[in-house]
Amino acid sequence: MKPATQVLIERYQKHLYAIAFNICRNNQQDAEDVVQDTFIQYHTYKKEFDTEEHIRAWLIRVAINKAKNITRSFWHRNKCNLEEYMETLTFETPESETLFDTVMKLPEKYRIVLHLFYYEDYTTQEISDILHLSVNNVKTRLSRGRALLKETLKEEWNDDE
């Protein structure tokens, strides 16, 4: 099963961009490059996939790896400000904006797991498959990420008072 690349672009482009943007630490251009490179790799990939879910997991895994490679790259020096990207986003409440800002400041290993769990609706088993981690490791990262997020938000809200 290998659906047309255009169909998958329409279906997964925004999700892959969000993941790549998260890993690339707020750099729009790098995130766009990751998404484009991911779909190019899919288009040239010779093997067939069993299910749509297998394709989705493969795309996410490739995007994560490409984004990590970019952030490790020697040439990855200039980054866009969070403020530049924030101008393109709309939030329903000020709290949503604060939450997004705080999640973006978390260490990568927590940020990715939280994003996949809460924004992409993956189960812990699916996340463990995508990231090649044990289910217990995913649960631990979710728990520690939530605790760190809660602690950081408490500090920010106490500072506002």
Show which residues each predicted segment covers.
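C-terminal edge and immediately downstream basic/flexible tail or linker adjoining helix-turn-helix-like DNA-binding
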Residues: 3-5, 81-83, 89, 130, ...
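A short pre-motif secondary-structure segment
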Residues: 113-117
